[in-house]
Amino acid sequence: YDLGMNLTHLSLTTPINANWAMAVALRPYSMVDYKSSYTRQIVGAENQIVNFDNVNSGGVTRVSYVNSLRFFKDLYLGVEAAYNFGTIQKDSSSYLFGLQTNQLRNSTRYTLNGASLKLGLAYQHRLSDKWRINAGASTEISGNLKGDVLKTFGSYSDAGNGPVLVSIADTTLFSAINGTTPAQQRIGVSVESPFHWVFAADYHSTKWSNNQSIEKGLK
């Protein structure tokens, strides 16, 4: 008997009065989930290869507190304060001749946390009894991430039940790190007939050029 479940977005919204609402939300901000494998020939050994397996997992989760205010009947302003946190694990294993019995593994674990701020503005106007127009824009200010990185090197044995550490892994690096989340801007407009038709266009920009990666933020 197996039971599995994924939860990607959890939110709770409550109205304070006719012009003010608040919300809290928990959702993924960034996810890491991929594997890769490749082989290389051993120099000087004919038809002998070394295998490399890379496994990357984890991610950053965002918990948000949101306030939404209505002005002049058709104008809305939103403010989102968020806290980002999570762990990213990167494992790189190597073994000879395609046999996973004995493996050498480099492991890297990033633990991250930091705050960010997002502002939004929306306008809604009724064109007729059946049609209305909506326009909105939002900007997310680049936020800071800080935490630590732990790198280890160890020897593993695999008898068919999964890799088991042979001896205590060596710590090759433990250091504080910092980085940033990229600034983002969105703008969109739509014309709709409620519950019938929606015609929409939007633009989204993420500014990666000024973003500091966590690898460059080693202290």
Q: What are these language model-derived features?
A:
Residues 1-219:
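Subset of outer-membrane beta-barrel
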